[in-house]
């Protein structure tokens, strides 16, 4: 039987309405006791495309829906590593680790971390961050950076608990679209 993806935390169900999985996560106690598994994804599967359709809007309302081709571009380059986190086989979080070989050394950057709203606070984000830190260290990266809006208070606390420190730096951006 195919169940809609549904996570229930503190009695508050969050449903995406999709029929993308045959597993249903329910109950804050069950979620807390489940193990989080992380893995690097190297190809654009239906499951990953569907996970982005569900998760990416929770990160950015302006992000465009990713199709197989777009996910393939993300996973098809040696500088990118797409990490996913699963609970009971269901993808509940993603993180993009970008490695940049520079004249000053290999640098790593974490981008687009998103954990399903109902799975937040249960170790999913930390599992993704820890996996990314390990991969970057194993690759010989000198540093690993990420940016996060100040309004994402819980995420910022997570990053600080994981060892990230705020830098005295200014981020500049030019909109190209």
Give the positions of each predicted feature.
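Low-acidity, Ser/Thr- and Arg-rich intrinsically disordered low-complexity segments
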Residues: 1-6, 10, 15-20
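Active-site acidic-Proline motif in GNAT/NAT acetyltransferases
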Residues: 116-118, 122, 150-151
């Amino acid at each position: 039987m195919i169940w809609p993806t549904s996570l229930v935390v503190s009695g508050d169900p969050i449903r995406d309405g999709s029929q993308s999985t045959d597993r249903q996560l329910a109950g804050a106690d069950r979620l807390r006791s489940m193990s989080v598994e992380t893995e690097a994804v190297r190809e654009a599967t239906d499951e990953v495309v569907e996970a982005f359709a569900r998760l990416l809007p929770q990160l950015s309302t302006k992000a465009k829906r990713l199709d197989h081709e777009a996910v393939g571009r993300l996973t098809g380059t040696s500088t990118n590593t797409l990490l996913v986190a699963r609970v009971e086989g269901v993808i509940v979080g993603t993180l993009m680790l970008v490695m940049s070989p520079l004249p000053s050394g290999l640098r790593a950057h974490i981008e687009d971390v998103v954990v399903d709203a109902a799975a937040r606070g249960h170790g999913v984000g930390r599992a993704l961050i820890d996996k990314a830190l390990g991969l970057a260290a194993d690759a010989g990266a000198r540093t690993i950076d990420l940016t996060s809006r100040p309004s994402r208070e819980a995420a910022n606390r997570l990053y600080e608990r994981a060892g990230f420190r705020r830098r005295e730096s200014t981020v500049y951006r030019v909109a190209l679209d």
